[in-house]
Amino acid sequence: RMIIGTAVLSSESYDVYFMQAARVRRLIADAFNRAFEMCDLIVCPAGAGTALPLDSDLSPLEYYALDLFTVAMNLAGVPAVSVPAGMAENGLPLGMQVVGRRFDDMRALQLAKHIQQFSGVDNRPTVIMGE
């Protein structure tokens, strides 16, 4: 969405915007590759705070900022999964993100499953059976 939102599909825009965005994406992927030389997984926040209350009224820029912790993983092409990791004092869930090496989705999913199980957060909707 960053590339499409910035670039117009013309030959001059292609060189200016698309190629530059592709270089930045490669730099981000390279940084993750270097990080994974030192570890198997990265665990980090899924967001800058708790989940939003239903009545939250944020500006478009504030909503965009909520993606801050997830954008790099998407650009790098590495698997990442977010899970509830606990509850904040205000009663809203906190999310944790597990990031794996490229094509090592299963390892990230396994750790994410353990984090969710041990967090004690069960946010599955209650099923109400009709008569």
Regions found by a protein language model. Give the residues of each.
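Structural helix-boundary/capping segments
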Residues: 3-30, 38, 75-131
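Short glycine-rich anion-binding loops that position phosphate/pyrophosphate groups of nucleotides
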Residues: 8-9, 47-50
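Short, surface-exposed loop/helix-turn segments at secondary-structure junctions
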Residues: 16-20, 49-70
